[in-house]
Amino acid sequence: QRIAEKKQGKIVSDVDLLDEIWAERPALSAEPAWELPVSLTGRSRQEKLHQVRREMESLGADTLVLSSLMDVCWLMNLRGNDVDCTPVMLSFAAVTMTDAVLFVNPAILSTEIQAHLKEDGVTIRPYACVYEYTKKLPEDSTVMMNLNVVNSLIRACVPASVRVIDHVDPTELPKAVKNATEVEGFRKAHVQDGVAVTRLMYWLKHNVGKIPMDELSVAEKLEEFRRERPDYIGPSFAPIIA
């Protein structure tokens, strides 16, 4: 922005030029989200919110705005299917000392999930309302956001009277440090995936040269073996068969 101003230019963040020419643009993904129980996460949503608020308090922040999909899902103990190979939902979140807001398409949340969120003090608002929320931050308050992560429009929506703390999201490090329950989940997942990969290797050794196969068909076979394992959801990346 400063560079543009020196050249008598201006960066506009609130206009999507593609909307003006893409008449049949697909709607945003709206796959159903699901909730992870504490038996898998090791920590409840309330525990995570409490830890985040302690960090906010230590830095003098009144509000936290989160835009990292993985951090939002970690904080809310929710998962989605809006991005290939990554179980996240299109969302934003805001946290204050007294409440929290999840900006998401309400249609992807079951009645049960919505009730659980309400019990934990989380309000649900439409996905795009994060911008209006940011515009209405209390005067002379302080908001924390990671300017390397939030989009430029969110930053532009912050009122001039609101102080911005540019800081690593307080969810980032706790998300990275796995608790005992999560570590055990990793171990079990690797065992199940190892069974699927071992079955693929056995299948390859007994069928190579006997039936037609290429990288695509082998990838499909691996996916077939993985789908047969308990609790399988989907691949974490496209298989590198070669």
What are the language-model segments listed below?
Residues 1-242:
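Active-site neighborhoods and metal-handling regions in enzymes and metal-associated proteins
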